[in-house]
């Protein structure tokens, strides 16, 4: 299972180009998608879910071209969790999932088994008889993820799946997605870089409608090698000077001053030392700001 995108362009009626000649191949497994707000990630996902038709370019899912004649066939292979989800407020969790699963054409017996399994995996079993309107935002996200998994999709597209979850639940959801991706493709879009560091070996970074990077996480980290510095300054004025001239990925007050992680090809000043413990967040910020 792979998804191929070739010279994809999405241009809206007002002339705004949200995606501009973007090309990418998404292989089996979990594939991360990073980018600032307005980078084009949501538009890309709307195309991949057949909600939005591309203006130009080619997209294919397992060899099936994205066009109106194939949309129904493609939709049967896809599961989708959007960033904003508004499920039926007056239905219970269980009723909502039974209804959504029924729309996907899953048999009742198989549906019951999958609902039971995913309720357990997402720690929602004890909440299955609550009305949707009674749930917290994090719980609604988990229900939304379950509905995206019910048809056992070949291609799962998820937008900010861990929003509103506590650390323990985030880890549970990440582990569930890793297990699910064993024989499938999962496109994982998030602003939480830590989630991608814990789940992905491949990712793409979007900026202004195009892919700034696509490839391995290790390759992205290698790109920032020698460009991450640990600097400790004595006062706020020195800190402001660094912030005015460089990208800063972290800042912390310590006993002997202010510790800052500075991203730069050149050594910022004589007090800075190389940091060889580069994080995915460091590499991402360095790439997008260099």
Question: PLM ranges: what are they?
Answer:
Residues 57-67, 73-74:
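Conserved ABC transporter NBD signature motif
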Residues 3-5, 18-19, 75:
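Conserved structural motif at the start of ABC-family nucleotide-binding domains
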Residues 49:
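Helix-to-loop junction immediately C-terminal to a conserved catalytic motif
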Residues 98, 102, 109-127:
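Conserved ABC ATPase "signature" region
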Residues 156-160:
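Catalytic Walker B motif of ABC-type/P-loop ATPase nucleotide-binding domains
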Residues 36-40:
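Walker A (P-loop) phosphate-binding loop of ABC-type ATPase nucleotide-binding domains
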Residues 172-261:
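ABC transporter nucleotide-binding domain
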């Amino acid at each position: 299972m792979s998804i191929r995108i070739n010279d994809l362009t999405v241009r809206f009626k007002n002339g705004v180009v949200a995606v501009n000649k973007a090309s990418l191949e998404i292989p089996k497994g979990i594939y991360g998608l990073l980018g600032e707000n307005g980078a084009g990630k949501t538009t890309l996902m709307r195309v991949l879910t057949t909600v939005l038709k591309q203006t130009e370019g080619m997209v294919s899912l397992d060899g099936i071209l994205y066009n109106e004649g194939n949309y129904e066939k493609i939709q049967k292979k896809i599961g989708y969790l959007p960033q904003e989800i508004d499920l039926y407020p007056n239905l219970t969790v269980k009723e909502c999932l039974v209804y959504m699963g029924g729309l996907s054409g899953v048999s009742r017996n198989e549906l019951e088994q999958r609902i039971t399994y995913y309720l357990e995996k997402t720690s929602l079993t004890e909440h299955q008889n609550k009305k949707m309107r009674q749930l917290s935002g994090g719980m609604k996200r988990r229900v939304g993820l379950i509905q995206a998994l019910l048809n056992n999709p070949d291609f799962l597209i998820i937008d900010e799946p861990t929003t509103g979850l506590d650390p323990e639940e985030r880890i549970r959801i990440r582990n569930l997605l890793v297990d699910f991706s064993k024989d499938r493709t999962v496109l994982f879009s998030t602003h939480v870089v830590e989630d991608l560091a814990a789940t992905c070996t491949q990712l793409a970074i979007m900026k202004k409608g195009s892919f700034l990077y696509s490839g391995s996480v290790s390759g992205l980290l290698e790109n920032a090698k020698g460009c991450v510095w640990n600097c400790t300054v004595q006062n706020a004025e020195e800190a402001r000077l660094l912030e005015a001239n460089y990208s800063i990925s972290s800042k912390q007050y310590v006993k002997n001053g202010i510790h800052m992680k500075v991203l730069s090809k050149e050594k910022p000043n004589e007090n800075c030392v190389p940091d060889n413990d580069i994080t995915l967040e460091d590499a991402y910020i360095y790439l997008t700001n260099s």
